[in-house]
């Protein structure tokens, strides 16, 4: 508890610096602006969104989560003794094999909030997910395809969608800024994608691992790690997702992005950044819903816009 209070005070100082920078830079959009105005978050799809070439994939609601996710969400947390430590993540997401618990939530022995979700995806390949992560963050409407109920806003540090690059290089080394509901709480997140091979993952041909640091769009603070491993199975692929939260570290402030985030309106206070079991449980459901929803039409989206 004392450590959490110390971290909360440290985040407060970081937040103050970020917000001060936001005021100085003046890059703040109106939180209640029209949906198609720059730097605006909004629910659902705007009339302009409906004119985009991928509009036929826009659903009014997110598809339900798979049954194993529903069962885990309704059940108790996984005991700490059964949760791999973050240091074992590379072994947990090995190129072959499986883990005793592939879908669940809980807290590690060292206090990290942990989430695991396995999603079976007929007709989907790892290459489709590498393409998706390089394609979706440049427009909020694309991001909303993933979870139309909860996703409100997306932007990318460097738009590489038109660059002559392999799909993985469009997002690795890049930062995605998103506003989304995870459970009842509106989060403003900065997700910095990193090279999985450089971080010790085995990524054979036909597989991928999407690996990144999860941080705040407002405060210069990272709060955890995420990894999505995609492996082929008969008829499609499986995604094995892992989240470890309450892994705090400071990062270089981005005052312009902080100003933009503040300008989009209120969200979860970065001073209350610690993830409890309820937050982990909500993230389990959110991940299960969005991965299952997008997988239903990702092959068609990929063939049309790759």
Where do the model's predicted regions map?
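N-terminal secretory signal peptides
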Residues: 1-7, 18-23
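C-terminal region of N-terminal signal peptides and the immediate post-cleavage residues
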Residues: 24-36
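Terminal "cap-and-tail" regions of soluble proteins that handle hydrophobic small molecules
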Residues: 36-109, 231-306
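Terminal, regulation- and interaction-focused segments at domain boundaries
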Residues: 107-128
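Short, surface-exposed coil-to-beta transition loops
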Residues: 114-116, 221-227
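Amphipathic alpha-helical segments
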Residues: 122-141
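A short, structured loop/turn motif at beta-sheet edges
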Residues: 123, 200-205, 229-238
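Glycine-rich portal/gate segments that line the openings of hydrophobic small-molecule binding cavities
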Residues: 148-221
């Amino acid at each position: 508890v004392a450590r959490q209070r110390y971290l909360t005070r440290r985040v407060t100082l970081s937040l103050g610096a970020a917000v001060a920078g936001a005021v100085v830079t003046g890059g703040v959009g109106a939180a209640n602006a029209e949906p198609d105005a720059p730097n605006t978050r909004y629910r659902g799809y705007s009339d302009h969104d409906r004119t985009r070439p991928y509009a036929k994939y826009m659903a009014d609601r997110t598809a339900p989560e798979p049954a194993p996710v529903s069962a885990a969400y309704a059940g108790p947390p996984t005991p700490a003794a059964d949760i791999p430590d973050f240091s074992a993540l590379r072994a947990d997401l090995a190129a072959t094999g499986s883990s005793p618990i592939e879908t669940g939530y809980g807290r590690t022995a060292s206090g990290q909030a942990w989430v695991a979700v396995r999603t079976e995806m007929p007709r989907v390949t790892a290459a489709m997910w590498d393409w998706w992560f390089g394609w979706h963050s440049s427009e909020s409407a694309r991001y909303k395809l993933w979870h139309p109920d909860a996703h409100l806003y997306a932007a990318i540090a460097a738009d590489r969608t038109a660059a002559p690059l392999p799909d993985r290089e469009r997002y690795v080394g890049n930062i995605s800024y998103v506003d989304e509901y995870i459970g009842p709480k509106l989060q403003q997140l900065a997700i910095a994608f990193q090279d999985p091979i450089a971080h010790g993952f085995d990524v054979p041909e036909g597989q991928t691992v999407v690996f990144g640091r999860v941080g705040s769009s407002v405060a210069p603070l990272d709060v955890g790690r995420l990894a999505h491993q995609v492996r082929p199975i008969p008829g499609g692929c499986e995604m094995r997702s892992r989240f470890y939260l309450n892994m705090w570290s400071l990062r270089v402030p981005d005052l312009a992005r902080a100003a933009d985030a503040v300008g989009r309106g209120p969200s979860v206070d970065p001073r209350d950044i610690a993830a409890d079991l309820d937050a982990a449980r909500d993230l389990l459901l959110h991940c299960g819903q969005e991965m299952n929803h997008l997988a239903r039409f990702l092959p068609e989206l990929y063939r049309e816009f790759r």
